[in-house]
Amino acid sequence: MAGHSKWANTKHRKAAQDAKRGKIFTKIIRELVTAARLGGGDPGANPRLRAAIDKALSNNMTRDTLNRAIARGVGGDEDNNMETIIYEGYGPGGTAVMVECLSDNRNRTVSEVRHAFTKTGGNLGTDGSVSYLFTKKGVISYAPGLEEDTVMDAALEAGADDIVVYDDGAIDVFTAWESLGAVKDVLDATGLVAEGAEVSLIPSTKAELDAETAPKLLRLIDMLEDSDDVQEVYHNGEISDEVAATL
């Protein structure tokens, strides 16, 4: 299965910057604490925690830092009264956008999310307005350089659902989200070194963006990710190589 414009299409990835990394770490720690508080500290019995651990390690968080976060959650961190909130909406060019938040104040969060949509020509939708276009999956990513057949055989043996090979040679292995950790363990044991592993929302359809709407979508994503309450942003925007070259 071939793919194209990987990072522009499935989930916007910005260049790593020190300030951005600090914000990413804060958000990952918040997710680790919440996942451990809600489901316990054993990643083998808590898929949400295992996914958060994989994401933390993919972002080079130290074991000491993530273990302290888990301990806070298991210990019933009194300061952590966060709840997961999912917002849905339409972005520039008719793109479907899902915004995953962890917040202790719904009013603040929805105000920030709505502002981002409004400023970029989109609109916040109701529950179910676009979620039917996305499927929750585990994604294990490999950098270019691996043989497709090697990864395919190992992935199928490990119980993965599918793999996607991109034009640049990068490979994504897709799993049921609850099986992400178990599949990754099997792939790790074969010697395949993953570049990242996370739970993601995968769109079933794509919305092609032109040179006018693509920058607006990227601005929407930037505004949303700048909110401390926003954990992840998913969309179905398709940005061609030709359009990307103009950005």
Curated annotation (Swiss-Prot):
GO terms for biological process: regulation of DNA-templated transcription. Signal peptide: none annotated. NCBIfam families: PRK00110.1 (NF001030), PRK12378.1 (NF009044), YebC/PmpR family DNA-binding transcriptional regulator (TIGR01033). One of its GO terms (cellular component) is cytosol. The keyword Cytoplasm applies. It comes from Yersinia pseudotuberculosis serotype O:3 (strain YPIII). Belongs to the TACO1 family. It is found in: Cytoplasm. Pfam families: TACO1_YebC_N, Transcrip_reg. Keywords: Cytoplasm, DNA-binding, Transcription, Transcription regulation. GO terms for molecular function: DNA binding. The keyword Transcription applies. This is Probable transcriptional regulatory protein YPK_2146.
